[in-house]
Amino acid sequence: MADRFMLGFVAAVLVAASVVAGASSIRVPREQPRADDYRVKAAFLYNFAKFIEWPAQAFATPSAPLTLCVLGVDPFGAVLDDTLRGQLVAGRTISVRRLAQVEPGCHLLFIGGSERSRLALLTGQLRRVSVLTVSEEPGFNESGGMIELFTDRDGVQFNISPKAVERSGLRASARLIALAANQRHPSGGRR
């Protein structure tokens, strides 16, 4: 059942990435991150937001946008803005901000590789704040992060820490949790 949901989730990500790229298919190289990798990862961020429920008090008003922040050096560039332009999550527009330090108002925080040495500190500061934390740094979940993106022989994948998500007051869809590599392959997620 989880494999069927994963197939649907990956298909949704690839369709979103294809529309943004103007291509009928996306080849995700495994060697080094490239623009296509980040196009797919941007689509993952969008889909993560669709499968997370934030408490009402996380937003200033009922119509406030969902704010996706990138902390540190931004590996996405314009790809993130292009992917999210015009998209909605639970009826909310999506706003993108780039930050040098954590600031209030973020709902989803992508922590870039330039922040590697501060991961444990950052996740500790955000431990009980309703901010979905995502990074592609190895060991992010073990440092207290919620979703860790990685690329393996099967393409872009993710691990999730349901306890970290719950502790922050967010609710992750059971479907999202079931799609995570570490939930489908409990021996560690990465293959």
Name every feature range the model reports, one short phrase each.
Residues 2-191:
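Short hydrophobic alpha-helices and adjacent helix-cap/hinge residues
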